[in-house]
């Protein structure tokens, strides 16, 4: 926990800036089919009101994953603060087999101790499945809550939690000297900060696999350029500034390469740069447009969008040679894919019957599931554990971010009050 806090604190504090209105999750679809779980409000052991609702944050995290359906607080049969106080029969009567309890205690030095226990209500009374304690300053209480969520989620699902991750996205405001901002926030929209301001458009942020850098497209020179910015010190490295279009950056999972699309020879084609040497290799060629690369876990294969068959579809190509292979066949067109970290599935923008939604395709069976029901959905980005997708959609005259679980159970919006929000990118584990 301490190491994780140091890493997160390092670039967050160095990039402290005037913060704008935060995006917030607004629930559109419930998770009635998720696993029932009890999350009790954490007992506050200090004077006045608690500085953060830790139990509420944990409950929200678990609900947003789509895998859990936390019991409404009004229906909690009791409000224990420790495993010893949990009455298993009271919870079992509500089909709850796991309960999260905890306490928040202030310290004389201004810090807080956050403790929690995950209690098995189906076993012997007081059976604890997981527990931990964290000492944090006030500004890190939400982070401590997300840590509780991560540990509970992993214990109950076997999947690593992704609640301490972040989102990068572009906000376009009306007017001002710098109407375009690249921002980073917690995955749920809290604690945003500005990475870069620009008078010209910013597009397509992409995280490095260690979470220390963002690649993105900027038009500040009067034409598109690809840059990589280090979050800790703000240093910017220009990596591509060729004639015509430079876009769609994607770091390889091993961190050694950057894939992107260039149209310097006419049509859009894929290129890969070795980041250590700066050497660039062309991966695709021909008259078709090839863009929007996303890496497979082996750092040797790319999925990408191509119109070589007429309409955009998703293809796979090995960067060391070989002909691209088409991998999408359902719908009139499919594009802008993001491959899961285990390589078992991908999410993409799928169009059919005049509708454009986010869909999930199993890369083994080829089965496709439509996940979203919003309007003109774009730019999906997977959480590192593959359980959630962030994407943008049109709402009214602008764009907003949306969240959907990859099982389709949970849907939410992350509206911003100060502009259009586009190009979301989910960070790796931090």
From Swiss-Prot:
UniProt subunit comment: The Tol-Pal system is composed of five core proteins: the inner membrane proteins TolA, TolQ and TolR, the periplasmic protein TolB and the outer membrane protein Pal. They form a network linking the inner and outer membranes and the peptidoglycan layer.
One Pfam family of this chain: PD40
Example of a GO biological process term: protein import
Gene from which this protein is expressed: tolB
Keywords: Cell cycle, Cell division, Periplasm, Signal
Cellular localisation: Periplasm
Signal peptide: 1-21
Function of the protein: Part of the Tol-Pal system, which plays a role in outer membrane invagination during cell division and is important for maintaining outer membrane integrity. TolB occupies a key intermediary position in the Tol-Pal system because it communicates directly with both membrane-embedded components, Pal in the outer membrane and TolA in the inner membrane.
Protein family membership: Belongs to the TolB family.
Organism ancestry: Bacteria, Pseudomonadati, Pseudomonadota, Gammaproteobacteria, Enterobacterales
Species assigned in the record: Escherichia fergusonii (strain ATCC 35469 / DSM 13698 / CCUG 18766 / IAM 14443 / JCM 21226 / LMG 7866 / NBRC 102419 / NCTC 12128 / CDC 0568-73)
Name of protein: Tol-Pal system protein TolB
